[in-house]
Every structure is written in C-alpha cells, then in structure tokens.
C-alpha cells in the first residue's frame, strides 16, 4: 500500500506584511526627560483633583516584541509590535477609609501615543474614581432585582451559571444543576435565552 505525501518547500524568504500600527517615535532612552515630565503632569493633575487624594502612582511602559511566524505551507513573516502605556493610580482617604482609582490608557504605538494623550484628563479620571469611592455610602445588601443588558451580560451569565451547565459537570453530578430537569433553579423572573 502506497501513501501519497506532499512536501512543501520552504520559501526561505521573509514576506513583508502591511504595518497596521506605524510607529512615529520608537521608544528608547532618549525620551527619558519627556516621559518624566509627562508622569509629573499626571501626578500633579491627580493630586490637585480633590483634598481626599493622598497618594498617586504613575508609570510609563514601552515594549517592543519581534515576532516570527512560520507555517507548514512555507509562509514566513515577521512582525514588530510596539506597545506604549501610561498607568495612573490615585489613592483617596477620609481618615477611616481608603479607596483607589486607576486609569491605564495604552496603544500599539510609540512614544507619540503619550504626546497625543490628554494626560491631565486621564489623571483626573483616576482621582475622580478614588475620591467618589471614598465618599460613597455602602451599597444596599440583600435580595435585589437585577437587569443585565445584552452584550457583556452574556459573559456574566456564563461565568455565574454557564460553567455549571456544561455537560461534563452535569453528567458527573458535580454541577449545582445536576438532576434538576423540570425543577425551578432560579427566580421566576429570570429568563435566559
């Protein structure tokens, strides 16, 4: 019995692919002073937002990843992925409680992303979250009706109930829904489609 086999000869060349994220300013050590100034601006904007802000933390990170992709059809391509991100954290205290706010804008871009970013607005956003949280009252507890919007609600439902409805868990009797066919397992107000 003869088996037919196909062998693909590698192309031995790297193909160029269109750059989806052109980099205007490649991140390197020459931008240290500019980055320090950007972080100082974020710190000042967050710190001055409200007297409850007692601490801030700001960081900038850049990563450059060189990727080589090859497949059995002889395709060989390379890609360079440059990512830039600013992380802004603010802590608010009221003497008894402590809350934090965070903002972390980033993009597949070079340092130009930071130059085009409204740093002060992002810093104030992080501070606003912390300040609002530290001044907020406690959420009501107990049984409450919940309405979940379409979209992300599906993810919430899956995490809350979906894993328990997976066939292997039900078949092995390890699911809370095992042996519940025909029985009510949630509020009569719950409808999952």
Name every feature range the model reports, one short phrase each.
Residues 1-193:
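Active-site bordering "gate/hinge" segments
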């Amino acid at each position: 019995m003869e088996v037919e086999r196909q062998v693909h000869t590698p192309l031995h060349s790297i193909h160029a692919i269109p750059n989806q994220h052109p980099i205007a300013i490649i991140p390197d050590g020459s931008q240290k002073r500019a980055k320090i100034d950007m972080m100082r601006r974020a710190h000042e904007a967050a710190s001055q937002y409200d007297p409850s802000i007692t601490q801030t933390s700001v960081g900038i990170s850049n990563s450059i990843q060189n990727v080589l992709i090859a497949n059995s059809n002889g395709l060989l391509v390379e890609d360079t992925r440059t990512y830039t991100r600013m992380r802004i954290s603010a802590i608010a205290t009221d003497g008894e409680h402590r809350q934090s706010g965070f903002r972390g804008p980033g993009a597949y871009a070079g340092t130009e992303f930071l130059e085009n970013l409204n740093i002060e607005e992002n810093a104030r956003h992080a501070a606003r979250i912390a300040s609002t949280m530290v001044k907020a009252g406690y959420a009501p507890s107990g049984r409450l009706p919940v309405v979940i919007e379409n979209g992300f609600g599906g993810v919430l439902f899956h995490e809350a109930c979906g894993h328990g409805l997976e066939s292997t868990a039900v078949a092995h009797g390890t699911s809370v829904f095992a042996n519940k066919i025909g029985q009510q397992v949630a509020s009569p107000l719950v409808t999952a489609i």
